[in-house]
Amino acid sequence: MQLLKIYYAYFSPGNTTEKVVSHITSSFQNYPVESINLTDYATRQEDYYFKENELLIIGVPAYGGRVPAPVVDALRHFTGSNTPVVLVATYGNRDIDDTLIELKKNVIDKGFIPVGAASFVCQHTFLKECAEGRPDEEDLKMAGEFGDKLKERLRLLVTYDAGDLEVPGTFPYTKPPMGEFPFKVETNEYCIYCMLCADVCPVKAISESNPKEI
């Protein structure tokens, strides 16, 4: 198929998912490329429309074995037109459970055709001793190699012949969506009220006037 543009979207509060997806996308450096940072609250409120001759690569972390709720909400603003999509899940060295199958179901419902999928180990967002330092150099090399294989597959592919891409997971889903985390992040005596945390919080959970209010 003849691609005209590549989009890569990611939800990456710890920046690790972004690293993986950007390395996959680097295989398509000869194409126009645009990133969509779904970690940003305002970006998730925008509408996006994709054509049949464009490719979307979307990466999300597994939250309790499911797609993060903010991403599910954001995908309601995505509309494809038989647009090929690549699904990427990252996880903190435990399991992705139903993350990929949930992501697949959400994008199919919005007019996308899954043509590839992968999962990568990344450092756990809250327990950094789990897969600390991942993705490492070898992980990112594998991400680039995955991108190279995708590029070759898409060169030979016609989307209506793509078939039903099999991904791990079960439906109905094994676990309910993750609700509130069982802990809260709190400031300490070193807080200087710079408000950076409130500015970058993906779900606007921190007061914009007082960071101690969460």
What are the functions of these language-model segments?
Residues 208-209:
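Short beta-strand "wing" residues that participate in macromolecule-binding interfaces
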Residues 2-40, 46-180:
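FMN-binding flavodoxin-like domain, especially the glycine-rich phosphate-binding loop
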Residues 16, 184-204, 213-214:
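Cysteine-centered iron-sulfur cluster-binding motifs in ferredoxin-type domains/subunits
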